[in-house]
Amino acid sequence: LMVPVMYGLCRRLTRRPWLAFVDGALIALDFMRFAQSRIATIDVYGTFFILLGALCMVWYCQTVLEKGVQGALLPMALGGVAFGLGCASKWTGIYSGAGLAVLYFGVLWARYKQQKPGFARELKLAFAGGVAFYVVVPLAIYILSYFPYKVHDPSFGLADWWNCQTFMYRYHSQLKSTHAFESRWYTWPMMLRPVWYYMGKYLPAGMFASIAGFGSPVV
């Protein structure tokens, strides 16, 4: 599903179908996406919703400049849902909110520079919609993502939900373990040291198994 989303995002940004096709083909052939999808890591869900949120935000920005905030409520709402699902998939989705916020407020400034009448009303609508769709809705989606816990254990409540959040934060903020194939972040664009996820052991004679994750520097 990342492929059509990337196609749509590139087409909205460039207005050129052939370039969007090339972009979609590049992500379709990206080994990192393929490997993580095949082994069902949770990262692929977060990445998908981050890309979907970016697509909706670009759609929102373009619509605001053409029709005003009142004509951009649909992409605003869909973008908020995508952002919430991304956060519910993995906390890395929260970081995408910074980029979305820059675009969200940046297009308001661009709209103001157009000097269209009724901007004050648009600004109020943008503020109300931003709080509703990018704060309230994502928070509700995140909390509801724990509903299976409630189904499994009816005694599960908000206190237990909060304990889950603090446990995850402590775990990731205090984690000291290392990985034999870890690499410095600045080497990632060129994939100088791809991560080796798995090497098969205790297999029958003559059998080998290996899973590695490395992306395309072009992407």
Named regions from a protein language model:
Residues 56, 61-65, 72, 83, ...:
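Perimembrane helix-loop-helix junctions
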Residues 32-45, 92:
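Short acidic/glycine- and proline-prone juxtamembrane loop motifs at membrane-interface regions
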Residues 24, 72-91:
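Membrane-interface alpha helices of multi-pass inner-membrane proteins
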Residues 1-14, 52-56:
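Transmembrane-helix motifs of polytopic, lipid-linked glycan transferases
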Residues 192-219:
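Membrane-interface anchor segments at the N-terminal boundary of transmembrane helices
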Residues 119, 123-130, 138-191:
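Aromatic-rich transmembrane-lumenal/periplasmic boundary elements in polytopic membrane proteins
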Residues 6-29, 64-74:
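Transmembrane-helix signature of polytopic, membrane-embedded enzymes
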Residues 20-28, 35, 55, 83, ...:
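Short helix- or helix-capping micro-motifs
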